[in-house]
Regions:
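Extracytoplasmic gating/loop element in the C-terminal half of outer-membrane beta-barrel translocons
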Residues: 50-172
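Hydrophobic, lipid-facing positions within transmembrane beta-strands of outer-membrane proteins
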Residues: 28-34, 155-160, 210-216
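Outer-envelope beta-barrel architecture signal
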Residues: 28, 39-41, 151, 172-176, ...
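Membrane-embedded beta-strand positions of outer-membrane beta-barrel proteins
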Residues: 45, 178-180, 216
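Extracytoplasmic loops and strand-loop junctions of Gram-negative outer membrane beta-barrel proteins
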Residues: 11-20, 138-145, 196-200
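Repeated loop/turn-to-beta-strand initiation elements of outer-membrane beta-barrel proteins
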Residues: 40-45, 167-168
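Outer-membrane beta-barrel pore domains and translocons
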Residues: 37, 48-50, 181-185, 219
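C-terminal beta-signal and terminal closure region of outer-membrane beta-barrel proteins
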Residues: 67-73, 78-85, 104, 140, ...
Length: 219
């Protein structure tokens, strides 16, 4: 039923076979580039993005390991005050039976009987195991997820120019315009915390940088 299977110590049991969590390539790659002009004003706009696909975030995994994830302090103070583990992972323990799989990981038989887990574990131990060592999708557990939907749309570029030539009368200046430029201004994304613009996060990349600029052009 999708619950994590835990051992007697309350920690996840490693699957002997790898599972397919999705494709890293998106279903769609989209882009829009256009220019608009009205009298002395012009506007260039660029929007792009992808739809579908998944990405693993090594950054999120390392944040859990090092206690830097926004949720990584959730039970730490309570555990410190109690002097004993207080976090009881949501999952099940095997009471009896066994799972038999073939060489490809297909289930041959499964007569296991489960019970809800009641074992509390150290919050640090849990954080440095499940969300760090396992590949967790948002569908499996949104709090501990490190595999995300990489869909996003971004206002990649916006360039606004205004020509002041007709408004000024300065000797020696035949043309004068001002330009405002912006890159990576806005983003809609499915994933929290991370920047899916890179397509993967295996090298602990910094997120894309927002840039704002202004230029003056005299002739």
């Amino acid at each position: 039923d999708g619950k994590v299977i835990l051992n007697d110590n309350g920690l996840p049991i490693r699957d002997n076979f790898q599972q397919n969590l999705g494709h890293t390539d998106p279903k769609w790659i989209l882009g829009f580039q256009n220019s608009f002009k009205y009298k002395n004003m012009s506007l260039d706009i660029g929007i792009d993005g992808v739809w579908g696909g998944v990405m693993r975030s090594l950054t999120v995994e390392k944040m859990w390991w090092g206690g830097k994830h926004p949720y990584s302090t959730e039970f730490r103070d309570a555990e410190y005050a109690a002097g004993t583990p207080v976090y009881v992972p949501e999952g099940v323990n095997v009471v009896s039976g066994e799972l038999v799989q073939d060489a490809n990981g297909n289930v041959v038989s499964d007569n296991r009987v489960f019970k809800p887990n009641t074992t509390a574990v150290s919050w640090q131990t849990w954080s440095q195991n499940y969300p760090y060592r396992a590949q967790v999708t948002e569908a499996e557990n949104k709090t501990f997820a490190n595999v995300f939907d990489r869909s996003f749309f971004k206002l990649r570029s916006l360039v606004f120019k205004y020509d002041f030539t007709d408004l000024i009368n300065i000797k020696g200046i035949k043309h004068f315009d001002m330009t405002f430029t912006g890159y990576n201004l806005l983003m809609w994304k499915e994933a929290d915390i991370i920047d899916p613009d890179y397509g993967n996060d295996n090298n602990l990349q910094d997120p894309s940088t927002r840039y704002l600029g202004m230029g003056l052009n005299f002739k």
